[in-house]
Amino acid sequence: MPQTPLEIDLALRAAKAAWEKYSYLEHRYGERGRRFTNSDSCWLFTLARAPREIVVTKDLEWLRTVLASRGIPTVILESHLTAVLLAIDQEFPNQPKKIQFDHFLADRKAERRRLVGAESGSHLVEVFDQRFRACTGFNVELAAELIASAWVDEHSGISGSLPALCNWFTDGERFSTDWIANVHELLVELDRVHGQTR
């Protein structure tokens, strides 16, 4: 865990940035989720200083599996890691760049490229984010990115990650019928694009 008040402050700043980027976290997990995000951030900050990248990568793979299976897609973890690195770089600009997360982050990019292609995946996310914004009723920012990430998690062997997210996004008590239809259409499109990239 962080050892000084400054390190704790940096970890909490990174947690705040990750939390605020994805309103989904607050909508779904509330204050309890914020506390978990803060504690995860302190642990991630500690990993950023770990001496061996291979150990860090294994720890991040474990955390990814835990989070994705609970409805928190890997893209949120990636964003959190980036926020940790940014907080460290801003506070200590003269220190060498931290590389402990590089292998894990590079693997995630390669995974997305392999499963849906870089351009196809980005295009689908853009199109469906516009469609989600146009839906009536309750709306969650960046939903298409989250759904696409959960789809990648599921197709990368994290069983149950897609329903852990999409069951919440298709709850008729929470979301409109047009929103729910778009969730299902995005999943169909991801399957279609995946079939073309094989």
Regions picked out by a protein language model, each given a short descriptive name:
Residues 1-198:
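Core of compact, soluble alpha-helical bundle domains
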